[in-house]
Every structure is written in structure tokens, then in C-alpha cells.
Amino acid sequence: MMKKMPPAIREHALQIANHEMGHYVVARALGFETGDVTLKVTMDLRHQAGASIILMRSISSIEEMKEHLEARLIVLFAGAMSQTLPAKHSARKLVDKSKASAILNGELGAEQDYAKVRELRHLLRNISYPDTDPASSERITAELKEITDRVWLRTQQIVEALADTITDLGAVLVDGMVIVEQWGRPADTYEVVLTGEMLERLRPVQAIPSLSVWA
């Protein structure tokens, strides 16, 4: 008989599921190919999770490169923002921006996302402002802030527009979790893998709209 997931574990699992489905849904909306989404949560609330995003794209101009980098930044920001969405159905689900910022900055576990963000935004700044003096630290800081603020705002718009899809798929992911029996050890881990093929058969995935990086 399936052991019922304790409420505290389910609540934690839903937050992480929303994080991964935020990456997944926003990536698909921006034209990235996607694969599996996985989630493991232990009884003591440790977790491992991932959403497979396929980054191969044909890029033949600087403008296409800038668009690709902005799209990648939006996908990275989307995880932390989606993690803050309320689980319950409401007229409009809103991102908690301060909590999303704390998640990205490593206080709540998305350090890898932010490490990629830091690197990609420098690359985007190098391309967007090629004439800036490398010694002008104040100018570079201002340019990085302009890029980050613009992409952050666009991510918020996209995540809030797709919030119901993200949280619905997050619930599907958690509903599929089963406790894993491990030989010689107590069963203490709930796990799920939704393959790319399984996800693409789901109606909410098929209904994800195609969106632009720029509003």
C-alpha cells in the first residue's frame, strides 16, 4: 500500500516542483526543446530536482545571440519566481519578488541557477555594450543592472501569465511521487520522473503558448 505523503513533505515538494516546472514551462514558451523533469524529496526535506532544457539552437547573428541569452536568463530566473507562486487556485497568482531574490541568492537553495545568471549576464553585457571601457566599473555595473532589471521584469510577466500552468504541472509532478524502497535501508525518499514524452502528452503542456523574449 502506498504510504501517504506527510503534509510538510508535500508542501516542500510542491514548492520545488513549481520551481522545476517554472523552468520547464517558460523554456517551452520561449521555444526551447525540453526533456524530463525529476524530483526527489527525503523525509528530512532534502531534495534533488531537475528540468532538462535543450540549449542547442542555430544562431547566425549578434541579435539572435542576444535574444538567446535573454531567453536563457528568463528561464533561469523563472525557477525561483515560480517557487514563490501560491499553490491554491486564486483569481491571479503573483510572484513574491523578494522571496524569489532570496532563493536565487542561495538563501533557499538555487545557487546553481544564480551562478549561471551571473556568467550569462556578463556575456550579454559584453555583446550589448561593446564600446564600454573595461576599466569603467561604474558604467559596467549600471549596464549589468539595466540588463538584470529588464530581464527580471519580463520573467515576472511571463511567470504570472503562465502561473496556473506552472502550478498545475507542479501538482501533477508531486502527485506522481512514490516512496522508494531501498535494500537494507528504511524507505525515506519520495521520487518521480516525468519523461519528455509523458509531459508532451499532457494537455496543459500542449496548450503552452509561444511567447517572445521581449514584451
Describe the role of every protein-language-model region.
Residues 2-215:
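Soluble catalytic regions of large protease machineries
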